[in-house]
């Protein structure tokens, strides 16, 4: 992510805000959803016609800033395969809005051998 990513998220002053993230396996895939699970071309069109900070339904939790009161109210299920989606669903059920900052692009880190995690 850009060096000022965290500061941009703080400055947005939202309860829950994330950067624009890509899929782990295919960086051309935008990892967020709005009004269901739109196709990639629909996501790009939505973003093109939206302000820099846009309300979404959910995304990956790669670079997400969450205010403490939100975390204190939401029980996070770490064992879920879709823990990020589940977190956003729980937040929305409690009435929280989720925002995404288009000016922050975050990709998964990979080492020179294209591994996501250290070899054991």
Please place each PLM-identified region on the residue numbering.
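Amphipathic coiled-coil/heptad-repeat helices and related helical stalk/stem segments
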Residues: 1-2, 84
């Amino acid at each position: 992510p850009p060096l000022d990513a965290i500061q941009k998220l703080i400055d947005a002053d939202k309860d829950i805000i994330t950067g624009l993230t890509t899929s782990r396996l295919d960086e051309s895939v935008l990892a967020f959803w709005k009004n269901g699970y739109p196709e990639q071309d629909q996501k790009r069109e939505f973003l093109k016609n939206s302000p820099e900070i846009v309300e979404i339904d959910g995304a990956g939790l790669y670079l997400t800033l969450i205010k403490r009161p939100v975390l204190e109210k939401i029980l996070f299920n770490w064992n879920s395969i879709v823990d990020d989606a589940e977190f956003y669903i729980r937040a929305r059920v409690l009435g929280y809005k989720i925002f995404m900052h288009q000016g922050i692009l975050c990709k998964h880190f990979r080492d020179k051998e294209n591994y996501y995690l250290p070899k054991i």
